[in-house]
Amino acid sequence: MSEQNMSIAIDRHHRGMTLDSEQTAIVVKNWNLYYGSKQALHNITMKLPQNRVTAFIGPSGCGKSTLLRCFNRMNDLIDIVSVEGEMLLHGENMYAKEMDVAALRRRVGMVFQKPNPFPKSIYENVCYGLRLQGINDKNVLDETVEWALKGAGLWEEAKDRLDENALGLSGGQQQRLCIARAIAIKPEVLLLDEPTSALDPISTLAIEELIFELKKDFTILIVTHNMQQAARVSDYTAFMYMGDLIEYTDTDSLFTNPQVKRTEDYISGRYG
């Protein structure tokens, strides 16, 4: 990473913060995940701060996306997955037997690597989640669609074409639409799984600037293979390797003064 980019990244972060001084959104305690008999996550313990951006970095196969999918129980969809440990969202056990998983996924929204708009109008894409909740009042839907598209930085480009098929949008616009769809139901946490890896540099910049704004209203967890992106957009960064959480601290410290040699080796490009 160039010194100029690192300086820009540091300037954008909230100075003087530490994990201990932050309000906590999610607590992870002794978290283990298995695919059958193969253990993929090893004893993960961490606190994820509220209204901050936390990035997960590490080489392919390190477990960062697997961990991300634990936060809204997407791994439940894989038959051979089993988990151990505790995961709390604002004090509630996310894996309690009585937890309504559908309700949890409304509280913890997710945007995937490849834009996946529905083959519906832009308007219907954004209000899809509201309709699933039985909300059909046109005034409510109209207000929410405008709010979500503005929040996703897409309103000016889409306001005169809300009835057009969302598949006619560019890749970058489609990804911002997916973000609008995710925030329309006002989740507490937003998960982003490599949200710009399929986008061009201009669209990537738009998404990164959007992430910086969205943390005012949402707790954001982002998986990225791009260390420069992690440095630019996140307040905290977790480095993972082979299913282990190696180092987790504020982003400035991790990139400028890593405390673990394996972290230093990774961010300096010695492996990964």
Swiss-Prot record:
Subunit structure: The complex is composed of two ATP-binding proteins (PstB), two transmembrane proteins (PstC and PstA) and a solute-binding protein (PstS).
GO terms under biological process: phosphate ion transmembrane transport
Name of the coding gene: pstB
Signal peptide span: none
Name by which UniProt lists this protein: Phosphate import ATP-binding protein PstB
The enzyme's E.C. designation: 7.3.2.1
Job description of the protein: Part of the ABC transporter complex PstSACB involved in phosphate import. Responsible for energy coupling to the transport system.
Family, per entry: Belongs to the ABC transporter superfamily. Phosphate importer (TC 3.A.1.7) family.
The reaction(s) this protein catalyses: phosphate(out) + ATP + H2O = ADP + 2 phosphate(in) + H(+)
UniProt keyword Lyase, yes or no: no
Location in the cell: Cell inner membrane
Binding residues annotated for ATP, in chain numbering: 58-65
Record's GO cellular component terms: plasma membrane
GO molecular-function terms, A-Z: ATP binding; ATP hydrolysis activity; ATPase-coupled phosphate ion transmembrane transporter activity
Listed NCBIfam families: 3a0107s01c2
